[in-house]
From Swiss-Prot:
GO terms for biological process: translation. The keyword Ribonucleoprotein applies. One of its GO terms (molecular function) is structural constituent of ribosome. One of its GO terms (cellular component) is cytosolic large ribosomal subunit. This is Large ribosomal subunit protein bL17. NCBIfam families: L17. Belongs to the bacterial ribosomal protein bL17 family.
Length: 136
């Protein structure tokens, strides 16, 4: 029986899953849209929704909870300064998942997870080694 089995294991250990979702949350908040596999996107959605709700509370305790969940201080600052005011009047449903076909190598179902009222210019901003080398 599968009573109480709510989340997918995604063929990873608990530590690996937690680290992966922390990185994915930070990437989604930074770029406001990421492409990943459909099961990962479905598991990421409630984590990000709870982080946005924490950002809307805007207390010291909620900020510390967000830091412990995400471990990226720059993205926590963006969560509380930019994302939370943007969704102040929305009660849940901050993200959407769009199916994006199948991956070429292993035919895995792919999906785009993005914020509903996302900033178009945020995608690809400050990412990759070329951005860092040009700035230096």
């Amino acid at each position: 029986m599968r009573h109480g089995k709510v989340h997918r294991k995604l063929n990873r250990t608990a530590e690996h899953r937690k680290a992966m979702f922390a990185n994915m949350c930070a990437s989604l908040i930074k770029h406001e849209q990421i492409i990943t596999t459909l099961p990962k996107a479905k598991e990421l959605r409630p984590i990000v929704e709870k982080l946005i709700t924490l950002g809307k509370k805007n207390t010291l305790a909620s900020r510390r909870q967000a830091i412990s969940e995400m471990r990226d201080l720059d993205q926590v600052k963006k969560l509380f300064a930019v994302m939370a005011p943007r969704y102040a009047d929305r009660h849940g449903g901050y993200t959407r998942i769009i199916k994006a076909g199948f991956r070429y190598g292993d035919n895995a179902p792919m999906a785009v997870i993005e914020f509903v009222d996302r900033d178009i210019e945020a995608k690809g901003k400050d990412s990759g080694p070329t951005q860092e080398s040009e700035a230096a």
